[in-house]
Amino acid sequence: NNSIIITADHGMQPKSKADGSPNAIYLQDILDKKFGDNSSKVILPITDPYVVHHGALGSFATIYLEDKSKINEAMEEIKKIKEIEIVVSNEAGCEEYDLPKDRMGDIICMSSQYMTIGSSESSHDLSKLKEPLRSHGGLHEREVPFISNKKINSFLSNEKLNNYDAFYYAIAGA
């Protein structure tokens, strides 16, 4: 009579060009060119260089700026990049995506479905990448399975399930 919930921490999307090469935007390089070296710091939550599939490239980045008066200008510059879908301030992004404000930079951005974001090209050694690039971290990788071996008669709210709800429903079903 045990409750079992099966879910995942995130989905995954292909992030390669038609020729198989990685599809990446190196945001630190772009910002350094526009605003100068050391004017910003692009932080990627996927930091392990696991070259089997993602090579520390993902769909999410947060950016800290030295000069806070340049936040709007930097956001406008990033919005010009075709494959960056989401560009928002810390406050707006943390509110919309339920992120901790004290752990996010001044700007939050996410790439399109088949694009990754890197810091600088020199920071990502993709020479050992033998398979087509695939990664996660953005809106297109949020959908994951949520499977229960028991019928769930009532949900916490009318909102959709999140993978972190698994523990609650496993216990509630026990």
Label every PLM stretch briefly.
Residues 1-174:
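Feature captures the catalytic ectodomains and active-site-proximal regions of enzymes
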